[in-house]
Amino acid sequence: MSHHDERTFVMVKPDGVQRGLIGEIVSRFEERGLKLVGGKFMQIDEDLAHQHYGEHEGKPFFDGLVDFITSAPVFAMVWEGADATRQVRSMVGETDPAESAPGTIRGDFGLDLGQNVIHASDHEDEGANEREIDLFFDEEELVDYGLDTAAWVYEDEQH
């Protein structure tokens, strides 16, 4: 990982998996110049769901959130790049797809606030990335490798 890169957690939710959007979503991040360093197709159990959404425990929508995220497989990913968390959040769009701009993932594919296709770490929550990455991935599951396109994506890299 170079000095200006950061890692961020992204998850295609059950509705995105069921609608066959994994490839489209991965392509968008790759086309942006981000590097995939971890990916895992998995079924979330209730324990992991409670850990992941712990901040919402006690809220009226919590049980529905847990039921939804455990209802079908998800595709968990770790992406790396300069300012990766903000880059990803801008590509994902607003939590409510109805408020998301066309061209964002939720603006293009999201239909419902509760089933909004994708989860991405919050860039305003310091430490959210590390917490979520550690929750879903062991360090040895993340691959650190060079990507030849870096020189063509970032101006401070040499050609």
Swiss-Prot record:
The keyword Nucleotide-binding applies. The keyword Magnesium applies. It comes from the Archaea. Keywords: ATP-binding, Cytoplasm, Kinase, Magnesium, Metal-binding, Nucleotide metabolism, Nucleotide-binding, Phosphoprotein, Transferase. This is Nucleoside diphosphate kinase. It comes from Halorubrum lacusprofundi (strain ATCC 49239 / DSM 5036 / JCM 8891 / ACAM 34). HAMAP family: NDP_kinase. It catalyses: a 2'-deoxyribonucleoside 5'-diphosphate + ATP = a 2'-deoxyribonucleoside 5'-triphosphate + ADP; a ribonucleoside 5'-diphosphate + ATP = a ribonucleoside 5'-triphosphate + ADP. Its EC number is 2.7.4.6. It is found in: Cytoplasm. One of its GO terms (biological process) is GTP biosynthetic process. The gene is ndk. ATP binds at residues 13, 61, 89, 95, 106, 116. The active site is at 119 (pros-phosphohistidine intermediate).
